[in-house]
Amino acid sequence: MDKFEALKIWEHEYGDQEYAHDVIGRKIKRSDYLMNNQVGWVVTYMRPLNQGGTNDEGNTIILHHHTALEKGDNFPEFYVDSIKYIVKYEEDGDFYYIESSEERDDNL
């Protein structure tokens, strides 16, 4: 995805804020799209395309680049810092969202 398209998604999610936090709380900076630094971010899919996800607004999410690496193609569950997250689907609104299960797995 080019930066122009990514920034349209940023504006939809965060407005004109220069800084925000991804779903797990990692700080991201609007101008640092695709940058591999402390506040860099990417646009990715909650349900990966190779697992039946769709390339539309209801399936995209902005994540810190470290969060995106940890999530990878894991679906519907993934772990970040030993905390379990679950991707859920809201059929009425046709969108995915992520919830924390508050369950830690210290064996990871």
Predicted feature descriptions by range:
Residues 1-42, 64:
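Short cysteine-rich loop/turn motifs with clustered Cys
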Residues 14, 45, 99-100:
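Short, isolated positions within intrinsically disordered regulatory regions of eukaryotic proteins
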Residues 28-63, 68-75:
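Histidine-centered nuclease catalytic patch
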Residues 52-58, 69-108:
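Polybasic, low-complexity binding patches
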